[in-house]
Amino acid sequence: MYKRQSITCAKCCPYGQVYAVEYQEQALDILRQNCAYLQAENVTVLAGRAETVLSELPVPDCIFIGGSNGAFPEILRQIQQLPKSVRLVVSAVTLETQAEVTQLLQDAPQLEIIPVFSGQSRKVGRYHVLQPYHPVLLFACTGGKSS
């Protein structure tokens, strides 16, 4: 299911409010459909780019970045200007993104880097082997003014 991170966050925090920011029109449509289908009523879907929309949102407790299309440095700069400390989680798939996020977050308070490996089994003769998918790195840290 495409764009599932926002819905997963919403289901984990049913009394919280999730703001999902997306700039691609097709992805916006899919996200809205998935929210309706899965009754994720506490998700507000916003059209735009995160680096543009972030300043218009209420100050968050947590931020998840599932992709930034090259805007991570600007998004991080805005997060560092928030008036309170927030939990920041960033997923990085490509080597370029992993290197960039590692460099930009290397001095972040409480930084954790968590490699996530997944795969699917497939049959080879009478055996089953695990066909790995690309690893993803999750970066978790504290950001904002009081960090």
Q: Language-model segments: which ranges?
A:
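Conserved SAM-dependent methyltransferase scaffold
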Residues: 6-7
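C-terminal substrate-binding/active-site "lid" region of AdoMet-derived donor-dependent transferases
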Residues: 77-133, 137
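Short, small-residue-biased leader/transition segments that mark boundaries at the very start
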Residues: 1-2
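A short, conserved alpha-helix within the catalytic core of class I
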Residues: 70-78
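Short SAM/SAH-binding signature in class I
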Residues: 58-67, 87
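Conserved hydrophobic residues forming the short capping helix/wall of the S-adenosyl-L-methionine
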Residues: 13, 34-35, 105
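S-adenosyl-L-methionine
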Residues: 19-60
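Conserved S-adenosyl-L-methionine
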Residues: 11-18, 82-84
